């Protein structure tokens, strides 16, 4: 297909007469832009669209087992990760380790997200079989370890409000997410609930997707969601360099750890 017109709202495609593999099934194809995942699912269900991608885990059950729809699930090269800024309260490595150990990522993937996600052990997803998922996770889910790390670090609940504090300041930080992907707010709320169990007050800050990269580059976050394709070209080097290449002398502001 070739592009006839392209706007923010939709793209119109026409059959390419010179396509190498012969005639294509449709003379024209319209691709509307539907950012909200719930609206996307409703449009598919009502027949307003014939095909949709990235149906949220809460809506996928509407189409599975329904003869009117064909559901295809594939192992994605996409990864969801939380970027932790090493400034402020999260600049403490024991606090960071406690945060990670307090999060039940397997439960999020299997139950909350209905098996549409796989817990990861490394930045590269298991769909790219480099063997990273066989590595031992030093910060595996263990809320008792989280409590111990925080206690060793001097955090106590001195006023009985359920939130730890030190030097008169509560253990609190923001988690920045966007909601155009249905799973991200669900994930953030689950993290928030798990952290509260170990005495951490995590507040969710929802922003427009278009602000995410800017906030990441400027370091304007405590913890920030990223949902990104790891191998746009079949090679993960761009993804790894973008997030983990050193930020010495400000050469890579996406790396909040320096």
Roles of regions detected by a PLM:
Residues 119-158, 179-186:
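Structural transition elements
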Residues 9, 16-62, 189, 201-203, ...:
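Ligand-site clamp/hinge motif
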Residues 109, 148, 201-212, 239-258:
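Extracytoplasmic/peripheral linker and loop segments enriched in polar/acidic and small residues
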Residues 14-19, 76-98, 102, 111, ...:
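A bilobed periplasmic-binding-protein/Venus flytrap-type ligand-binding module shared by bacterial periplasmic
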Residues 23-27, 93, 140-174:
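Immediate post-signal peptide segment of exported/extracytoplasmic ligand-binding proteins
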């Amino acid at each position: 297909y070739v592009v006839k017109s392209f706007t923010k709202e939709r793209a119109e495609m026409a059959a390419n007469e010179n396509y190498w593999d012969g005639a294509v099934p449709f003379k024209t194809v319209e691709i509307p832009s539907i950012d909200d995942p719930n609206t996307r699912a409703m449009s598919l269900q009502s027949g307003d669209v014939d095909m949709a991608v990235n149906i949220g885990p809460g809506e996928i059950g509407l189409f599975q087992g329904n003869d009117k729809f064909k559901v295809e699930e594939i192992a994605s090269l996409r990864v969801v990760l939380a970027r932790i800024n090493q400034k402020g309260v999260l600049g403490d490595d024991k606090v960071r380790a406690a945060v990670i150990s307090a999060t039940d990522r397997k439960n999020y993937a299997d139950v909350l997200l209905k098996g549409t996600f796989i817990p990861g052990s490394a930045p590269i997803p298991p769909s790219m079989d480099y063997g990273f998922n066989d590595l031992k996770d030093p910060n595996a889910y263990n809320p008792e370890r989280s409590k111990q790390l925080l206690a060793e670090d001097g955090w106590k609940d001195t006023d009985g409000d359920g939130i730890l504090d030190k030097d008169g300041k509560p253990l609190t930080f923001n988690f920045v997410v966007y909601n155009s992907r249905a799973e991200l707010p669900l994930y953030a709320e689950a993290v928030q609930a798990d952290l509260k169990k170990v005495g951490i007050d995590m507040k969710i800050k929802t922003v427009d997707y278009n602000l995410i990269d800017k906030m990441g580059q400027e370091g304007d976050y405590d913890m920030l969601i990223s949902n990104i394709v790891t191998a746009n070209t079949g090679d993960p080097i761009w993804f790894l360099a973008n997030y983990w290449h050193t930020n010495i002398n400000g050469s890579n502001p996406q790396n909040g750890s320096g």
